């Protein structure tokens, strides 16, 4: 109808995003007269696109995905604490003609850990593969949740060390950055409770695992932010070794649910959102997964193998 609220997803590309299916299902389940649409926009056009939102009486809210999350950070009027910490915006909320920038990636990640794996980070050690925007959101959320040690492993060691220093400085956590060939890395992986892949290694079915799977041990949780394919080589090898495994659909779902609540003030039907995601992917989660996991490729992965650029919605 003419009064329908419009919700948009900014990105480039956006054609294969699962967010429209998920959010439109949530709007319908909530009885909200609204439509969530993908809006492909180049970086040069993003400022004008954001400005157009201010003049829309029926603007309901927006998501931001690659490659615009960092640019969106500078285009909003105010920021949530999470967005300010991560340095990126994935959710935009209209507040009295002003635009509030939020980042739901980290909280979405934590919720997926709690809800789908009954995993509490407090007092546990974690290894993060990658050092880009996705790794930043994950590392910050784990540090704030009380993880005992966060080991950031990246091909470019300077990026890993820089992120570790930021987490230690801002949150007072115990984080270290290591290169892929650091002799300390194997033992850190063997002895951790959680391994998180935030890189794009695994998006292609021919990709090998991003680390040597012989380092994985029974009982640890191996979480790959990639959700398409639902089972990456890393998760497949982890399952063989008796690990608990998770893909990225959970994170995509929960970060989207948090965004919906910010826009509407209502909690969405997460079941309707989950069903829409699974239908959009067109395949079922592997039996080893605690629940359906991931979508466009990843919930929030870094686009360069073990280097990374930024998160994806």
Language-model features, listed with the residues they occupy:
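Glycine-biased, low-complexity coil/linker segments
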Residues: 295-296, 307-310
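Adenosine-phosphate binding glycine-rich loop
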Residues: 123, 221, 225-285
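Phosphate/diphosphate ligand-binding glycine-rich loop within oxidoreductases
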Residues: 2-119
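Rossmann-like adenosine-cofactor binding region
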Residues: 173-245
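NAD(P)-binding Rossmann-fold cofactor-contacting core
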Residues: 147-171
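Conserved S-adenosyl-L-methionine
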Residues: 144-149, 241-244
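Glycine-rich adenosine-cofactor-binding loop
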Residues: 11, 101-106, 113, 117, ...
């Amino acid at each position: 109808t003419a009064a329908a609220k419009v919700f948009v997803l900014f990105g480039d590309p956006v054609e294969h995003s699962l967010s429209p299916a998920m959010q439109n299902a949530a709007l319908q389940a909530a009885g909200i007269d609204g439509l969530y649409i993908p809006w492909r926009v180049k970086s040069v056009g993003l400022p004008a696109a954001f400005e157009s939102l201010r003049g829309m009486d029926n603007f309901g809210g927006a998501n931001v995905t690659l490659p615009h999350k960092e640019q969106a950070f500078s285009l909003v009027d105010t920021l949530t604490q999470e967005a300010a910490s991560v340095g990126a915006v994935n959710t935009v909320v209209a507040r009295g003609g002003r635009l509030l920038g939020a980042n739901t990636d980290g909280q979405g990640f934590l919720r997926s850990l709690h809800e789908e794996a009954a995993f509490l980070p407090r007092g546990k050690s974690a290894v993060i593969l990658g050092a880009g925007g996705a790794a930043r959101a994950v590392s910050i959320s784990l540090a704030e949740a009380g993880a005992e040690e966060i080991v950031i492993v990246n091909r470019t060691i300077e990026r890993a060390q820089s992120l570790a220093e930021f987490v230690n400085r801002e949150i007072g956590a115990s984080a270290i950055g290591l290169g892929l060939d650091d002799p300390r890395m194997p033992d850190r992986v063997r002895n951790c409770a959680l391994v998180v892949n935030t890189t794009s290694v695994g998006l292609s079915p021919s990709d090998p695992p991003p680390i040597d799977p012989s380092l994985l041990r029974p009982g640890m949780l191996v979480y790959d932010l990639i959700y398409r394919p639902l089972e990456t080589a890393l998760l497949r090898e982890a399952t063989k070794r008796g690990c608990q495994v998770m893909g990225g659909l959970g994170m995509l779902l929960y970060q989207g649910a948090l965004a919906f609540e910010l826009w509407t003030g209502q909690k969405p039907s997460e079941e309707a959102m989950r069903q829409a995601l699974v239908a959009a992917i067109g395949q079922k989660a592997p039996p080893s997964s605690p629940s359906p996991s991931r979508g466009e490729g990843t919930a929030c992965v870094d686009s360069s193998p073990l280097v990374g650029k930024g998160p994806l919605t």
